[in-house]
From Swiss-Prot:
UniProt enzyme class: hydrolase
Cross-referenced InterPro entries: ArnD, Glyco_hydro/deAcase_b/a-brl, NODB_dom, Polysacc_deacetylase_ArnD
Name of the protein: Probable 4-deoxy-4-formamido-L-arabinose-phosphoundecaprenol deformylase ArnD
UniProt lineage: Bacteria, Pseudomonadati, Pseudomonadota, Gammaproteobacteria, Enterobacterales
Gene3D superfamilies xref list: Glycoside hydrolase/deacetylase (3.20.20.370)
Highest taxon, organism lineage: Bacteria
This protein's UniProt keywords: Antibiotic resistance, Hydrolase, Lipid A biosynthesis, Lipid biosynthesis, Lipid metabolism, Lipopolysaccharide biosynthesis
Pathway: Glycolipid biosynthesis; 4-amino-4-deoxy-alpha-L-arabinose undecaprenyl phosphate biosynthesis; 4-amino-4-deoxy-alpha-L-arabinose undecaprenyl phosphate from UDP-4-deoxy-4-formamido-beta-L-arabinose and undecaprenyl phosphate: step 2/2; Bacterial outer membrane biogenesis; lipopolysaccharide biosynthesis
Family membership: Belongs to the polysaccharide deacetylase family. ArnD deformylase subfamily.
Reaction(s) catalysed by this chain's protein: 4-deoxy-4-formamido-alpha-L-arabinopyranosyl di-trans,octa-cis-undecaprenyl phosphate + H2O = 4-amino-4-deoxy-alpha-L-arabinopyranosyl di-trans,octa-cis-undecaprenyl phosphate + formate
Pfam family, one: Polysacc_deac_1
NCBIfam families in the record: PRK15394.1 (NF011923)
Domain NodB homology, chain residue ranges per copy: 2-260
Molecular function per GO: hydrolase activity, acting on carbon-nitrogen (but not peptide) bonds, in linear amides
Length: 296
């Protein structure tokens, strides 16, 4: 039996309004619990369009057929008009998710975090995280105990800033296994549970065809030597590719693969490490990557 952490990122208004209810229904039918990370502030994701001037981002949008994958409402959100606030407008959906799944903060403003947090000072970052946590806690009526940085935009500054909130764990980086990042003080920080497997948009049209993706991914899961963690997006697997996701769950069950919330992957003893800036094939720009203590 192979146990895989299932992380669901919710980046947009449409992903929350349409994708999450569909995913909740799918997961219920398959008796699966997951960790769902919500963006709760304004939906300004359309402002990423300026990144089309960067060849790597343009190629990603073309090979993943972004217009049909996400829809023009997502691709243009927050461009010619202020982005709609996601959280309170979809409070009932988020509360329903929290009844059955582990719920955490993805971002207050996903676009702002992904585009600008790398240049924020620590207090600006703390204020932004606090705003998101406060909003999500108002919606679900209970403390939020986990978070996942938007776009995996995380480095030492993010690790230090999140210590102020005493969360149970964060999932801010890519890597191989859960660990505790070393703080500037030399003490171990809040546990990190890295994503180990590629996302749909990172590999479609580059490493694998759409129709071959599920078999390709299951092969990666079964060969994973660490602690497998897979991320789906409400805007993708909850919308245009929900049938592909259902097929993945059926095939996974046949292969003895089970999915669980990320917190079930934690153990009392974890290795030490750091979160450093790095790059992942198929994703434009830097993102947080796990570095085991003592390695370079």
């Amino acid at each position: 039996m192979t146990k895989v952490g299932l992380r669901i990122d919710v980046d947009t208004f449409r992903g929350t309004r349409e994708g999450v209810p569909r995913l909740l229904e799918i997961l219920s039918k398959h008796n699966i619990q997951a960790s769902i990370f919500f963006s709760v502030g304004p939906d300004n994701m359309g402002r990423h369009l300026w990144r089309l001037v960067k060849p790597q981002f343009l190629w990603k949008m073309l090979r993943s057929n972004a217009a049909s994958l996400y829809g023009w409402d997502i691709l243009l959100a927050g461009t010619a008009w202020p982005g709609k606030e996601i959280g309170h407008a979809n409070a009932d959906i988020i509360r329903e998710a929290a009844k059955h799944h582990e719920v955490g903060l993805h971002a207050w403003d996903h676009h702002a975090w992904q585009a600008r947090s790398g240049n924020w000072d620590r207090q600006t970052m703390i204020d932004d995280i606090a705003r998101g946590l406060r909003t999500l806690e108002e919606i679900i009526g209970q403390p939020v105990t986990c978070s996942a940085a938007a776009g995996w935009r995380a480095d030492q500054k993010v690790i230090e800033a999140k210590e102020a909130f005493h969360l149970r764990y964060n999932s801010d980086c890519r890597g191989a296994m859960p660990f505790r990042p070393l703080l500037e003080s030399g003490n171990p920080g809040t546990a990190q549970i890295p994503v180990t497997l590629p996302t749909w948009d990172e590999v479609i049209g580059r490493d694998v065809k759409t129709e071959d993706f599920n078999g390709w991914l299951l092969n990666r899961i079964l060969r994973d030597k660490g602690t497998p963690v897979y991320t789906i997006h409400a805007e993708v697997e909850g919308c245009a590719y929900q049938h592909n996701f259902v097929d993945l769950l059926k095939r996974a069950a046949q292969e003895g693969v089970t999915f669980c919330p990320l917190s079930e992957l934690l153990s009392e003893t974890l290795p030490l490490g750091q979160v450093v800036r790095g790059n992942i094939a198929g994703r434009e720009g830097w993102l947080g990557c796990q570095q085991i203590a003592g390695s370079r």
